[in-house]
Amino acid sequence: MASGIVEGGGSLSDVYSSAKRILLKARDGIERLERFESSSMDSPDLASSVKRDITEVRSLCSNMDTLWRSIPVKSQRDLWRRKTEQVGEEAEYLNLSLEKYMSRNQRKMLEAKERADLLGRASGEGAHILQIFDEEAQAMSSVKNSKRMLEESFSSGVAILSKYAEQRDRLKSAQRKALDVLNTVGLSNSVLRLIERRNRVDTWIKYAGMIATLVILYLFIRWTR
């Protein structure tokens, strides 16, 4: 009986020592992962290694649970039961810590992806806005050019009408002088009426030219808008 207890206890001791050694390694891995997290670093290989260690400890804990039940002495059996439970609890605690770390890491990766997507969309929208601004700038430039052309055309029209008015005044003065000369030399009334008719025709031509100029300016304004 004693030999059985020693053999059982020895077997449990070996398994327990292996479990404690792997737990220590897993705990150190968790601490390293948390340090990496605080420095914004990631180590997927280390996380996978810690996960494998915890799985191995769970397997050893299952073996320990079978072994302590075979110990005939109650006091020894209770002792190894508590040790087995402690190993299992520590393995579960480390597994929970690892899951929390992986959850935080996954959330950070998702947030980083969302930020990248937002920046990408913002960049695309920015380019679209710049394109709109360019089109608006081109439209404003076209309006300014049209306005300048209209002002130049209006100024040219005014200058032409002014010159035409000056010519009309000079023509009237010349006509009056010619009539005076004709009256002096005694031309017939038919000749005088012919001259007056020509004056009326010139007056109609003058007003027709003014109206045509105004119509052209109006049509140009409508075309440029």
UniProtKB/Swiss-Prot annotation:
Tree of life domain: Eukaryota
Name this polypeptide is given: Membrin-11
Lineage: Eukaryota, Viridiplantae, Streptophyta, Embryophyta, Tracheophyta
Entry keyword Acetylation: yes
Membrane topology: Single-pass type IV membrane protein
Keyword Transmembrane helix carried by entry: yes
Residues that span the membrane, as ranges: 201-221
Entry GO terms, CC: Golgi membrane
Family indicated by similarity: Belongs to the GOSR2 family.
GO molecular function: SNAP receptor activity
BP-aspect Gene Ontology terms: protein transport; vesicle-mediated transport
Role of this protein: Involved in transport of proteins from the cis/medial-Golgi to the trans-Golgi network.
Location in the cell: Golgi apparatus membrane
Residues recorded as bearing N-acetylalanine in the entry: A2
Key words, A-Z: Acetylation, Golgi apparatus, Membrane, Protein transport, Transmembrane, Transmembrane helix, Transport
Intervals, Vesicular compartment: 222-225
Ranges facing Cytoplasmic side: 2-200
Organism: Arabidopsis thaliana
